[in-house]
């Protein structure tokens, strides 16, 4: 026999014993909802078409507590978008992050879309971004934005975007390629130019700068610094050895030369991800930025 452990969108944990002789399972544990009795957001999952008009993409939506379809809500697109990661799963609350729940309790609507290039959908799905990271991903994310704008309860004048690492790269990419769409963005540990990123990742998906100069030029955000219009906060750890501080600092230098005004916050001594009480401080800062400029 084997032990099978899994989640469902409305069940945090199931455990069953499955017979290897006949495949029949016996449930031995089904976890109760730990949030029973609390006011919680509505978590849902759906699909839209990718920019190629044929590929199905999955999204997660977290609606505010006490949701009223007659109101218009500030909406945050949470994005990662890169290879090797997916955000939307058929697990507990569709794999929603606790920060999404917190923001929904504060009156925001959250939208998370797994664009082409993300993981576990096959080689063709992931390889569409090869040698030009960020480009197809942005097109798919903008399909998500079009979908959001079609909903009567989404305030199209109060759209925000937030992501970390590859998601930080996507956040700045979206804000500089579509400057009239996003009012506020928070980019954490963002890649700015792939030639400065670690080669075991960058060259796997981009080839070398010598073999793919046009791809590196197209995906670099340095030349896009002058396009920035909305409020953008960039956050990094000063000891980040994954996306080294050179990325953010070079982008800030380009912004100063182009006359654009992003905000910048540094965690001294921290790496690519904040840990412990610094993580709490980080999420307070991200939340405050949206409260100040989007809500």
State what each model feature region is.
Residues 1-295:
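Serine-hydrolase catalytic core recognition
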